[in-house]
Amino acid sequence: MVRQNAAANRYEFDVDAGEALAFYHLADGVMTFTHTEVPAPLRGRGLGSQMMHAVLQDVRAQGLKVVPRCQFVADYIRRNPEFADLLA
C-alpha cells in the first residue's frame, strides 16, 4: 500500500526489501517530484510503476498538479497518458 508521509515530503510503498519512495515538494497546488527510489534487489520488477500509479491517483484525488523533475516520473506519465492532465 502506498501512503503519503507529508511530514517527510514523500510517498512510501512497503515492499519485501524495504520501502520504495517518491520524494516531492508541494507549493501552490503543485507537487514537484524530485526523486524516486526502489530497493536495488527489487529494481526492474515494476514496483516503481505500481507506486507511481497509486501516487498519481492520490495526487488527482487531492486536486493537485504535477511537475516531474524526476526522469522516472516524467517517463511514467509519458507512457501512461491518462495522467497527462495532471501536468502543471
What are these model-predicted stretches?
Residues 5-7, 27:
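Structural motif
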Residues 15-43:
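A short, structured beta-strand/loop element
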Residues 37, 46, 63:
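Conserved functional loop/turn residues at catalytic and ligand-binding sites
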Residues 42, 46-51:
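Conserved acetyl-CoA pyrophosphate-binding loop and the N-cap/start of the following alpha-helix
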Residues 57-88:
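C-terminal structural segments of small proteins and small subunits
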